[in-house]
């Protein structure tokens, strides 16, 4: 055999060997992947529950993705069905969490676009690969989601339910711009199911507009955090400016006044979020007060406004669709059912504790008169004395 022929045969066998090695690696990877897949029936069942919950929240996945999911389910082929479902749902995941066989939690940022709305809730998914097969509760914490309760100046109003609270500084308030909710209402749960792969729903709220960063810490029971903060994810969000609404509030005589408003979306979220309110809006009550001509920023969506002005006025409701464009004017006409002042009866509270009793020690702490006067006007209280 000629030398040139020997060289050609040698190259041919090298190519064949290389192709066989690649094929073997692919088959091994496919086998490992198949071993790590959840059982098909419960995975499809959980996927359907996830879609039902997203529909209920008013945040369904895209129509074409829902159609692709149904096509994947109809395949009834474990490897292809599960892989196709994951490929579709992973686009909506802000977090990918892995629990290794030793139950250590590791987290990274997912493929979803980190975008929020000022004063609005945004829904994302969390993908969890549970290699340990544990059934503990999944927990998510963030220092940016800590309380800003009762911050006036540079301290917190004491509600005396859990002892003397730590001070919350103005810097803390700036950093605590976010609220967070792991959605666990039926059919979703907070506990892991022990399936190898499952998805959770998380909702995030931004108090602010602009660029904001947050850290998220994941755990699944005690001592499950991975070493080196690998269970923590830092994400930079783009928080879009919401639509500013102009309130026009008139009393029974058609004169401008102040009223109480409880604002809800169809999921029951209260706006602005009570956890992120700053004076003059207070965290310990659902309502906020707005006088004629004032504004509030809300993201696009449908809201129910419940408004009144204390016990002398009827409680009325109005459904409002907020969309982009020019700031809409919202008109609220109050309706009084009784006027005790015509019988020489006047309402009042001459003993208003603005910060429990701490203001006896530090008069600067608590609610300022300028903030409290809005509440008095909004409840049609004739006399109010702040201690």
For every predicted segment, state its role:
Residues 63, 74-239, 382:
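Long, low-hydrophobicity ectodomains and other hydrophilic envelope-associated domains
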Residues 186-191, 195-203, 231-233, 270-296:
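Short, solvent-exposed S/T- and G/P-enriched segments that are highly enriched in secreted/extracellular
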Residues 230-239, 320-343:
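Extracellular beta-sheet/turn segments enriched in Thr/Pro/Gly and aliphatic residues
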Residues 243-252, 261-263, 303, 332:
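A short, amphipathic beta-strand motif
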Residues 253-278:
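Short, ordered, surface-exposed loop/turn motifs in non-cytosolic proteins
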Residues 261, 300-310, 376:
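A short, solvent-exposed beta-strand micro-motif common in secreted/extracellular proteins
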Residues 287-290, 295-298, 311-329:
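Structured interaction patches on ligand/partner-binding surfaces of diverse proteins
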Residues 312, 316, 341-387:
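Catalytic cores of extracellular degradative/oxidative enzymes
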């Amino acid at each position: 055999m000629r030398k040139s022929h020997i060289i050609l045969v040698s190259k041919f066998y090298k190519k064949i060997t290389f192709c066989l090695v690649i094929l073997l690696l692919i088959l091994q990877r496919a086998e490992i992947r198949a071993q790590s897949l959840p059982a098909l029936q419960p995975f499809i069942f959980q996927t359907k529950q996830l879609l039902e919950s997203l529909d209920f929240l008013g945040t369904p996945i895209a129509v074409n993705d829902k159609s692709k999911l149904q096509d994947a389910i109809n395949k009834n082929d474990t490897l292809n069905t599960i892989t196709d479902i994951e490929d579709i749902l992973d686009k909506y995941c802000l977090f990918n969490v892995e629990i290794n066989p030793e139950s250590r939690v590791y987290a990274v940022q997912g493929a979803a676009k980190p975008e929020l709305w000022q004063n609005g809730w945004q829904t994302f998914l969390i993908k969890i690969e549970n290699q340990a097969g544990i059934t503990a509760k999944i927990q998510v914490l963030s220092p940016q989601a800590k309380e800003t309760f009762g911050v006036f100046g540079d301290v917190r109003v004491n509600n005396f339910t859990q002892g003397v609270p730590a001070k919350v500084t103005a810097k803390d308030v700036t950093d605590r711009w976010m609220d967070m909710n792991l959605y666990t209402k039926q059919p979703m749960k907070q506990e892991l199911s022990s399936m190898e792969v499952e998805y959770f729903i998380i909702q995030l709220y931004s108090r602010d507009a602009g660029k904001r960063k947050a850290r998220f810490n994941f755990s699944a029971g005690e001592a499950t955090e991975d070493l080196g903060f690998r269970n923590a994810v830092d994400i930079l969000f783009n928080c879009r400016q919401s639509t500013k609404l102009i309130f026009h509030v008139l009393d029974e005589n058609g004169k401008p006044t102040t009223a109480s408003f409880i604002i809800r979306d169809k999921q029951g979220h209260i706006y602005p979020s009570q956890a992120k309110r700053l004076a003059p809006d207070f965290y310990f009550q659902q309502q906020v007060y707005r006088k004629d001509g004032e504004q509030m920023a809300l993201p696009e969506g449908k809201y129910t406004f419940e408004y009144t002005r204390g016990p002398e006025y009827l409680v009325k409701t109005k459904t409002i669709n907020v969309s982009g464009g020019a700031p809409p004017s919202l008109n609220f006409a109050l309706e009084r059912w009784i006027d005790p002042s015509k019988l020489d009866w006047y309402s009042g509270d001459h003993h208003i504790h603005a910060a429990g009793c701490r203001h006896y020690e530090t008069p600067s702490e608590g609610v300022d008169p300028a903030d409290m006067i809005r509440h008095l006007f909004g409840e049609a209280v004739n006399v109010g004395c702040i201690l």
